[in-house]
Amino acid sequence: MLIQDYLDICDPVLTFDRFMGEIELEKYLKNIPQHYTGRLRYDPVSMLKTVLFGFMANGYISLRELEDQCKVNLRFMYLMDHQAPSYRTFGYFINEVLADSIEEIFQDINKKIFETEHVDLQHLYIDGSKFEANANKYSWVWKKATEKSRYRLFGKITTLFEEINEELSCTGMKLCINSEYAPEYLKEAAEQYAEVWQINEAMFVHGSGHRKTTQQRHYEKLKEYAAKLEEYVEKIKICGEDRNSYSKTDHSATFMRIKTDYMGNDQLLPAYNVQVGIADEYIAVVDVNQYRSDMDCFIPLMNKFYTTYGFYPKYPVADAGYGSYNNYIFCGQHGMEKYMKFTMFKKETTDKKYHEDPFRAVNFPIGEGGIMRCPNGKSFYLQYRKNVKGNKYGRQEEVYQCEDCSGCPYAEQCKKTDKNRTVRLNHELTSMHQEVIENLESIKGALLRMNRSIQAEGTFGIIKNDRWYKRIVRRGIKSVLLEVFLVSIGHNLYKYHNKQKKVATAA
C-alpha cells in the first residue's frame, strides 16, 4: 500500500500537496549548485515542501524535529518519499537555498490563496508584537553611555597630548590638540612618538618590581586609547542613527520592554518588533523592525505592502500605537483613510468631562480676526512657531500666550504657574484627530475596530499560544526575517487548510 492510502482525504498534508502542486516551485531553487560530488542529492522540491509543511503543521519546527519527523511521521514520509535528510542538510537548505527567495515564496503563496479565497486587501488590520531575541539578557550596549565614555576619553587624550607635547618640546614635534579625535590619528601619533624615541616594544618591562619609563607609559597609553576609541566608534556604528542599544550576542537585536516580564524585575530584554498586516485572517504583509515604537513601523510596513501588491490598502486599521502626525500625513498622500487611533482616543471618546473641558486649549472659542479667547474672555496671541524635533514632514507647533492672567477667577482651574498661561497647538493635527474620531465612531469604524481586535490580535494569539512560537531562534536581522517569513507562510497554509476543511465538512 502507498502512504497516501493511510491518510484521510482531508488530511492537511494532502491539502498542502494539492495546493503546492499549483505553484511552480523550481524557480525558488536558484541557489542550488549545478555540479556536486558524493551521494545523490535529495530532491530540492521535496525538501522545500517538507520545510514549509513543517511550519504549517507545527507553527515552528526545529531542524532536528524535521529530521525526526521524516523518520517516524507518515505525512513527512509522504512528502520526502521515505527519505530522511539530516538536520544539517535541512539547515543548509534553509540558510543557503531559501534565504534569498523566501519573501518571493511568501508573496506567491499569498497571491494564490487570496485569489482562491477572494480575500479583501482593501481592509488591512495592523498590529505588532515584540518577540524576545536569541541573545544574552545582560549583554546590552547603550549608545548614550558609549558616547559619554567616548567624550571622557577625549579629555584623557587631550591631557596625554599635553604631557607628550611638553616632553617633545625640545625635538620640535607637536601633537595637535582638538576637542575630538579619530582612532587613526592616535595610531599615527603613536607611530611618530615611537619613531622619535626609537621605541622597541621588546625592551618594555612589565609586572611588579619594574619601573616603566615615561616613554613606555606614554606609548602604551596612546595604543590603549586608540584601541578603546576604535571600540567606541564601532559600538556607535552598530547602533546606527535609529537605535539606542544593541546586544553583544546579537547585534541586530534592540533592548525593549516586553509584556512578559518573566524575570520579575522590569528589565529591558533584547527583542525584535514584528509587524503584521492581516486581511481576512491571513497575514498579507509581515516585517521585522528594530524600532521600539509601533509608530515608526507603520510607513515601512505600508511601503512593503505596496511593493508586494502594487497599491495601498484603502482602510488601514490600527490601535493607538500607530496614530501620529507622520502616519496620518502618509495616509493622506497615498489615498488611505485614517482609521488608526491616537494616544488620547479613548479618553476623548469616553470621558465627556475631559472632552468638553472649557479650559482645554482646543475648546477655546475663536473670535473675530481668528483670535483665540479663554473662558474669562482674554485673548491668546501667537508668540512663535516651533519645529517638532525629528519630524520629517516639517510638523510645527504654534505657541500662544494669554494677554493677561492677573486677577483671573479661573486661574486655579486654568493654569499651574503664576505667569500668563502658554499653550501649544497644532491645528492640522487637531483636525486630523477629529477626522479619526468621526471615522472610528461611525458604524463602519466600530465594525473595523472589532475586526482588528479579532483578526490582528487573534493572529498573534494563535502564533504565540496555540502554535507555541514565542521567541526568535535565529540571530541577525536577515536570519530573523527568514524565520518570521517561514512562520507566516505556515500560519497562512494552516488557515487555508482549516477553511477548506470547513467547506468540505459543510458540503
Question: What is each PLM-predicted segment?
Answer:
Residues 1-9:
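Long, acidic, intrinsically disordered low-complexity segments
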Residues 2, 46-52, 89:
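A general alpha-helix detector
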Residues 9-49, 55, 427:
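Basic, short loop/linker segments at the boundary and entry of helix-turn-helix/winged-helix-like folds
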Residues 39, 81-82:
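A Lys/Arg-rich helix-loop hairpin that forms a DNA/phosphate-binding surface
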Residues 51, 59-72, 83-507:
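Anion-binding and metal-coordination hotspots
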Residues 75-81:
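Secretory-pathway/luminal and periplasmic proteins that interact with or process carbohydrate-rich
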